[in-house]
Amino acid sequence: MDSQRSHHILTRLTKIRRRPQQPLTDFTELYSRIANETIYYLNLEEKKRYKEALQGWKALTTDVLFKQTLIEHNYPNTQSYTKDEVSLQNGIRELYHKSVMHLKRVKKLVREEPAPRNDMPSSKTYTNHSSSFTRSTEPPPVFQMVPGRMMKTLRNRNACGYKTAYSNPSLSSYGNSTSIKRGEDAENIRVNFVPSKPLSNNASRQHKNPIEHNDPPLKKETELYSDKYISEPILIDLTNDEDDHDVGILKGHNVFDEEESDGFEFDVSDYYDNFSEVDVEEEEEEKEERRRIKTLEAIQQQMSDLSVTSSTSSNKSVSSSENVPGSCIQSLPTTAPALPSLPPPPLLNVDRASSTGALKPHSLETSTTMDSSKIRNPQISKLMKNNHVPYLKGTKSTPTLITKSTPTFITRSKSNTKPIIKSNASSPTSSLTVPNSVIQKPKTAAMAAKRVLNSKKVASNPALNTTKKSHPILKSKTAKVPNSSSKKTSSHPSRPVSNSKPYSHGASQNKKPSKNQTTSMSKTNRKIPAQKKIGSPKIEDVGTEDATEHATSLNEQREEPEIDKKVLREILEDEIIDSLQGVDRQAAKQIFAEIVVHGDEVHWDDIAGLESAKYSLKEAVVYPFLRPDLFRGLREPVRGMLLFGPPGTGKTMLARAVATESHSTFFSISASSLTSKYLGESEKLVRALFAIAKKLSPSIIFVDEIDSIMGSRNNENENESSRRIKNEFLVQWSSLSSAAAGSNKSNTNNSDTNGDEDDTRVLVLAATNLPWSIDEAARRRFVRRQYIPLPEDQTRHVQFKKLLSHQKHTLTESDFDELVKITEGYSGSDITSLAKDAAMGPLRDLGDKLLETEREMIRPIGLVDFKNSLVYIKPSVSQDGLVKYEKWASQFGSSGS
């Protein structure tokens, strides 16, 4: 709020005015904390720490119930809550109910005590095969991966040449046995020290030893890659030196095509489903691995051709390693298995891509995507299909994926703690920058709460649910955006995070989203700076997104009727405006937004007396609107009707009753509705008014106090703009009626005539207290000029009874007759004011005892109260004024009282 920064004299008043926002702050903080703790406990469940999760769920449900009760106690007036506060309150309740469901489910899991599965890829082993090299018998303690522990590097610090490999780029060629051009690429690579996390259970099962990838090559000899293990390469490396290792592999092997990678899109829902795969899929994975053994031998020969021993790259590699000690050189393996890209693949550099000229026979330009359908090598494509490519993410066409298990990479970065942000640009150099337009998920649940606050805005404008880029960022899990090419439907958010349904085999290749598919990311999340995301992103963000979007979708479903009405109205307004020719769009929007009024529920019975005026209105307006087929030719209804008379006689009430009884669209016009500070805009507003009225016929254009708009043009003080408004109003008004009286055919000189009843059922209904001030041309167009006089004796009698029908009173018929006599000359509004003041008489008699007296003990209203009120309430119309009205009515009025 800008007022918080200003230091002016109203600062204290500003703080007082901010007090009602306190419930919003409390709800936001509570929602954020619930969401964060929910994600944390779901993460504990994924790690099979059910007892800790059970205790957490119990504490969370109890605390949420207490906090919510406390907030409702502190702010008991729930009716004064804003829409944002109600939305947050509903979101908190939804999260609470979900927590209760999680609590029941975890209790069941604790009772069953299922056999725990180890999620650590470093400790998960295969009996037959899982890696292309062996592990050291005593790995260094730095490689004992523990969730949440921050490690500077995954390399073996005891290995020979460790510091030299980092300090001297020329020695980087021996750091990874699988890199192609380490010597020539090391100068373009920065090492990232961000800790690596296991990708998923599937990833840990399929790729057991990538974490120890740097340790054995530095300790073992060249015979490390024996025939026993060389048949299966490492497909995913989760170490933190991907900038050195995997970029070289991508550069050398060139498995991917950057131009074809735009078609590859990543399904985040499929990506996270791997965390909760059931044991059945483990058996399927074992079968798939047995099947892959047959294909790995054929691929090994192709990968070995791209190793550091190739003739094209050996010269530079040898020259770059001249300063390496002999013991270290001997430890370099000769035929290292290739490492396909990690999820997500590291950024590629222009220099790095252009420096691999020796590898052009195997090059596919610059490669970053791992879509098996795009790979030219059929053997590698088949291998990728068997290994479930959803673990690998798209490249420059998609930004980073926020997940705890995804290692982050930094290329040409001065700080090793900043996560990488991928660019959507097509050039390779764009991968080195951090674009502002990249959409990111919220870091914490506080940002998620903002999405709840903005849920209505996002839902009311579907255009906000799309991104500016042509590439989808992440697949949405909300129910707002249907995704036909994904297995995840709108019912997905209702499922718990830890019990996600595993996807079927091959879904990654067949279920990719379209290139231009929209997402439900709000624009608020796009503005989160990348600098705020320090270190590896947390997997709790996934749960936050699930819980928040689920609560948002539920709130949006409750507001769907209201939102649908608004959206439908906007669509209809746009269609109407598009169908109108020669009408300014902005002026038409202003007419819709400010002038269109739905008819108030005022009926004939609500108006006391004025029977003659009611009959005239029925004949001139109601009957022609309801039966247009009978009113043609000479029976054509009038297009203008003027209600004039003293103030307070019920002219506006009659107009409202006409709108209700005729079931027509009601336009309430005043001088401010048709005036603009810009030259020529007022005429456009008048034109748009009549055009829309014709389109929405039957309609009534009611102009109260029309003398302010259609005053006499003979006045010397009149300016040019007001004259133009009057002229345009008169011209548009004339177009409503046919030029040839009695003709049933349209006249070419008039755009809208009786030939089309739907376009001509428009009435200009006006009311004024100064009928003699109206311009003569406007008076001519008011064919009916109805005089609304002061209420007669019978009318006043009926009005008094109507006003006192719901009040306790002691008035008899004789008292009512006396009231009618003493209120001679009072208008309808004067009588209403008199009755209100008389109703205060019993309360005035109580004085200070009013606060202690029961309602039933207050005496009823009597005639004496009305007589006392006559001292204060006087008639508002003078006798001289009445004479003037009657004179004008006899001269220009079309009907008497």
Curated annotation (Swiss-Prot):
Biased composition annotated in UniProt, kind: Low complexity: 307-321, 480-496
Region (Disordered): 112-144, 195-219, 302-398, 413-438, 456-561
Residues where ATP binds: 645-652
Basic residues biased stretches: 468-478
Key words of the record: ATP-binding, Nucleotide-binding, Phosphoprotein
A Pfam entry, by short name: AAA_lid_3
Keyword Protein biosynthesis annotated: no
GO molecular function: ATP binding; ATP hydrolysis activity
Domain of life: Eukaryota
Compositionally biased residues, Polar residues: 120-137, 364-380, 497-523
Post-translational modification Phosphoserine, affected residues: 536
Basic and acidic residues compositional bias, start-end: 209-219
Recorded GO CC terms: cytoplasm
Keyword ATP-binding: yes
Other information: Present with 300 molecules/cell in log phase SD medium.
Similarity field: Belongs to the AAA ATPase family.
Record note on quaternary structure: Interacts with SPT2/SIN1.
Protein name as catalogued: Protein SAP1
Lineage, highest ranks first: Eukaryota, Fungi, Dikarya, Ascomycota, Saccharomycotina
